[in-house]
From Swiss-Prot:
CDD domains: Tryptophan_synthase_alpha. GO terms for cellular component: cytosol. The lineage of its organism: Bacteria, Bacillati, Bacillota, Bacilli, Bacillales. It comes from Bacillus velezensis (strain DSM 23117 / BGSC 10A6 / LMG 26770 / FZB42). This is Tryptophan synthase alpha chain. The active site is at 41 (proton acceptor), 52 (proton acceptor).
Amino acid sequence: MFNLRDSEKLFIPFITAGDPLPDISVELAISLQNAGASALEIGVPYTDPLADGPVIQRASKRALENGMNIVKAIELGGKMKKNGVHIPIILFTYYNPVLQLEKEYFFALLRENDIDGLLVPDLPLEESALLQMTCKKENIAYISLVAPTSEDRLKIITEQACGFVYCVSSLGVTGVRSEFDPSVYSFIRKVKEFSSVPVAVGFGISNRKQVDGMNEISDGVVVGSALVKKIEELKTKLVNPGTRADALLEFEEYAKTFGRLYSVK
């Protein structure tokens, strides 16, 4: 099971599998690794993404139109590993796509494609025991989400945590935010007190100032919507073989602003 404890401040990016195209997702993963990513979340596109804001919803729509599904997303993770991605890969999926597969087949796919972690944002703690137990048996980190509303269950969640704890910075859906409620900072400190694994903060991280602020009180950040939005902006250049290399380099340089390779020029 992967361990991020010895890393510097964590930079955990999120991309939607198959957006804008599956092969380009592999190249984006390599760019993110080059940009200093500690681990990578790949999101399974879903028709009813309750936790996702408009940016990731649009990415899911594009990926679904390209035929992406949970099986292909897992296989895409395996392709990333075969093409030189050595950082941990975490599958981010809603529970319904998992239910569509036989449990044995699902975990065989994860194992065969060298997937390191699993994050299911809409599965309540009380219903996750079987999935957590199977993940432990398969040496896959089951990533726990904690939100300000789950404070009363904080001790239980952090005791069961593997890999890292994903601390939700704000209530509502994912998306870029200009500022956070002041109460979130005391909540993150409380999560740190309870957790024996690193605590990474996500939902709304969109600039270096926010990264620096969260790094002061946590072990790092998860960045999703800002990166997915950049992919959307670069889509035309990414799908064009003649401009792809330049677009990937631009994406990589942008991603560096969130991680340990950031430098003021």
